[in-house]
Amino acid sequence: AITYPALPSIRLAEPFEQLRDASDRMLAKTGARPKVFLANLGTVADFTARATFAKNFFEAGGIEAVSNDGFKSQNEMIAAFKASGAKLACLCSSDAVYETRAIDAANALKTAGAHVILAGRPKEQDGLKAAGVGIFIYAGGDVLGTLRSVHAMINLNPGAER
């Protein structure tokens, strides 16, 4: 008879739990979790789907999403970002709105000190990258790898103090 050693037991949720544990440690140390500001562009109909996706995406990694109902002006958006205390900002809207507003919004958020992320996978990314978008989140993307990169951006160490 042929015998093989048993496969090691793994829990697929464990890497995400490590990210949330890092968030819990930050909460215990500073009184606040890491935050991402949802920079919702356009109307509620334009941004709701991607804002909901982004909220769930980041919260799976222990990053609190700061939501809103959109903004009448870019200055209003930047003021809300600064007031949020977030280091991360995620642009959320439809592809049509991104075509006309995303580059200016990304530039403004980057100038305000944000690490800029965009919810979606637009065909034309070069202009967005040049404007400061560092990460694109979308269905089918590497959620765990992206969340680890985001944690590294804001100096969270998921493996510490386990």
Give the predicted meaning of each segment.
Residues A1-S93:
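Non-catalytic terminal/interface segments that mediate subunit docking, oligomerization
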Residues N107-R162:
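Peripheral docking tails and interdomain loops at the edges
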Residues S93-S94, R121:
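Active-site-proximal beta-strand/loop segments in catalytic clefts of secreted hydrolases
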Residues A79-K82, I103, N107, D126:
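Alpha-helical segments flanking ligand/cofactor-binding loops in enzyme cores
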Residues G62-E64, D104, G113:
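C-terminal accessory domains/tails appended to large, multi-domain proteins
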Residues T43-T48, V97-T100, E124-D126:
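Flexible loop/turn segments at secondary-structure boundaries
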Residues Q74, V97-N107, T146:
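Active-site-adjacent beta->alpha loops and helix N-cap segments on the catalytic face
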Residues T52, N75, I103, P122-Q125:
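Residue-level marker for well-ordered alpha-helical positions
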